[in-house]
């Protein structure tokens, strides 16, 4: 099935979406990703294949800063592990997602087999961050944050440098919106973690 797109040589618009539920299973998608490592792809729970364009330089810089700050905290805290945007997770609803930044509790990570750790981990991270770029429409990102929470994330942040807002999602609560904050606290979910948002604006 992966040979439909491999080798791939075509031009697609940013965040190109095509419904493949009738021709591509989750396992087919996993193989497609392995066969095309140069592409960043996701698969929705309803079978939509999403081809995502590379980030611009400014967005890449912001992503690196997010990973640096969360990674520094995680190295000291040692209660979990951090992943960058190249990591694909298989969520309980069947979606394949690659959050910009994510964190998984150490006990959940250690409970995976070696094969699961080496492949696409079958879990939803405990904490995720998505960073909006100028080309991103906001509603699909908001839907993605709700999906993370519905699949087991304890907290999810949507950071919008365009509007200088941070949306905080938690289970069984409406999203909290912070307007132009200087810092955002991890509170109980990530005790001691405080993101310096000024580095992202």
Question: Model-flagged regions — what are they?
Answer:
Residues 1-201:
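Gly/Pro/Ser/Thr-rich low-complexity, intrinsically disordered segments predominantly at protein N-termini
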């Amino acid at each position: 099935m992966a040979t439909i797109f491999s080798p791939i040589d075509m031009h697609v618009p940013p965040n190109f979406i095509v419904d493949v539920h009738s021709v591509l299973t989750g396992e087919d998608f996993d193989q497609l990703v392995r066969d095309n490592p140069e592409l960043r792809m996701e698969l929705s729970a309803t079978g939509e294949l999403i081809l995502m364009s590379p980030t611009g330089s400014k967005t890449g810089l912001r992503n690196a800063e997010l990973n640096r700050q969360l990674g520094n905290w995680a190295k000291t805290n040692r209660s979990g592990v951090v992943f960058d945007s190249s990591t694909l997770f298989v969520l309980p609803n069947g979606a394949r997602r690659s959050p910009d930044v994510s964190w998984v509790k150490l006990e959940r990570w250690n409970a995976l087999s070696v094969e699961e750790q080496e492949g696409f981990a079958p879990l939803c991270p405990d904490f995720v961050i998505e960073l909006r770029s100028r080309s991103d429409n906001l509603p699909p990102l908001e839907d993605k944050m709700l999906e993370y929470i519905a699949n087991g994330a304890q907290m999810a942040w949507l950071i919008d440098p365009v509007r200088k807002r941070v949306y905080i999602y938690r289970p069984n609560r409406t999203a909290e919106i912070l307007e132009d904050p200087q810092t955002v606290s991890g509170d109980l979910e990530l005790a001691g973690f405080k993101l310096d948002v000024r580095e992202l604006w």
